[in-house]
Amino acid sequence: LGEASVALGINTTSAGERSLAIGASATSTGGFSIALGRYANSVGEFSIAQGDHAETGADDAIAFGRESKALGIMSIALGATANASKEYAMALGASSAASAANAIAVGRNSAAAGVDSLAFGRLSAANAANAIAMGAESKAAENATAVGTNAEANGLNSIALGSGSIADVDNTIALGNQSQAVAAGAIAIGQGNKADGANAIALGNGSITGGVNAIALGQGSYAGLENGTAIGAQASAQGKNSVALGAGSVATDADTVSVGNTTAQRQIVNMAAGDISTTS
């Protein structure tokens, strides 16, 4: 027994100064440490291990719950089989895991694997440094942020906000339920829209871009090929470098500008007179 320590139970050991061990085969070896439960093991000074097979492995660590483990300095593990394995890590919830320094995992089976990462929600996963995943089954990569049920920010520096939103490649942004930004640098904002070309922008519910640098602005707008631009509800720029301006406008051929469609034409008015030159 350590000085002024207490051990209660079969094969119980309280070796640290002023330590406390209660339960069969419980062990408290750190000074001022506490081990409560069968096979509980409190190693660090001022640490607390409570629950069958609960374990602390460093100073000021706290483990509460069956088979919980707080192995890093000042780490905290709360919940059955929760595991905070690095310094200052925190795992809250059954089978949660915070496996990097300063990582925080909150929720059943949540996992924060990167330094300074945060996973909040059932089965959420912050897989790399500075990742933030908030929402059931959300996922985030390095420096990425995913917020919402099943949201995924899989690319470096990507952002996915909304249930089922996906920012799949580096530097992408998907904002809105079921929105998808799946090419490098793409931006998708709105419900159920998709930006599928590099540096493409899809803004508006149900808008879609399918080409590099394409832009679709407006509900249900579509810019399908490289450098296409569609502005307005249901506007459709189908050709390469084409432009569709106004609700329902359709530009089917490459390098064309459309302000209407085959059944609804528009006039372009209030234009200044042009200049006449030898190249006009």
Spans of features found by a protein language model:
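Small/polar residue-rich beta-strand/coil "junction" motifs that cap repeat-based extracellular fibers
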Residues: L1-I10, E17-N41, E45-N109, V115-S280
